[in-house]
Amino acid sequence: MLYENMSDSFLLSDAGLEFDEALLEVDQEKDDYLDDFENWTVVPVETIEGINYYPNCLPESVQRNLINNVPKELLSIYGSGKQSHLYIPFPAHINCLNDYIPSDFKQRLWKGQDAEAIIMQVYNPGDGIIPHKDLEMFGDGVAIFSFLSNTTMIFTHPELKLKSKIRLEKGSLLLMSGTARYDWFHEIPFRAGDWVMNDGEEKWVSRSQRLSVTMRRIIENHVFG
């Protein structure tokens, strides 16, 4: 499904198109396992196999160019959880993000190809996303770029009762594959800020509006409907 511009994609994603509806489910899949975190073990995020994090991955010029070309309705402060779904070919200011995904990641997981499906998600202060794993219609390998501000992502492994967290900074890239993609749940808590370690102690940091760009490949021969 091809769109001439991002505005078309944003408007059509609310129209109930089958492919878009399937993609919407990606960020709404959840198992009711989180009764509480008591007796869970906190582990460093670096110990989770399949997670790679690149702070300051994107130049400021690339970040500004993308934000300047995002439809105003997507970045509106009114309403929560707004998404824009894009499929190849992407506009140039978005397609260039493929250049910042490590080539060995693409070679190993995407057969050397670029992403072919993107979800742009806006988070206003207080917004979040429930614990979930990506749908099986997506192949291994997820790339998440962060724009505008920072947030904290939580990882949980209910079978092993393990939990972890990572600070996703503006301009950063988070890669998930293998164990991190298939065995761990990830979420962004619904709250107005995050506890962040600073000078040896945790301090509450209020959130600002954030835009995430999540890039994936679709499993070959996947059929909708």
UniProtKB/Swiss-Prot annotation:
Q: Does the keyword Zinc-finger apply?
A: no
Q: Does the keyword Oxidoreductase apply?
A: yes
**What's a Pfam family in this record?**
2OG-FeII_Oxy_2
**InterPro entries membership:** AlkB-like, AlkB-like_sf, ALKBH7-like, Oxoglu/Fe-dep_dioxygenase_dom
**Keywords in alphabetical order:** Cytoplasm, Iron, Nucleus, Oxidoreductase, Vitamin C
The GO molecular function terms of this record are: 2-oxoglutarate-dependent dioxygenase activity; ferrous iron binding; histone binding; L-ascorbic acid binding
GO BP: any one term: DNA damage response
Q: Where in the cell is it found?
A: Cytoplasm; Nucleus
Question: Per the database record, which ranges form the Fe2OG dioxygenase domain?
Answer: 114-219
GO cellular component terms, semicolon-separated: chromatin; cytosol; mitochondrial matrix; nucleus
Q: Which PANTHER family match?
A: ALPHA-KETOGLUTARATE-DEPENDENT DIOXYGENASE ALKB HOMOLOG 7, MITOCHONDRIAL, SPERMATOGENESIS ASSOCIATED 11-RELATED
The Swiss-Prot or TrEMBL record describes its family as follows: Belongs to the iron/ascorbate-dependent oxidoreductase family.
Tell me the protein's name: Uncharacterized protein P8A3.02c
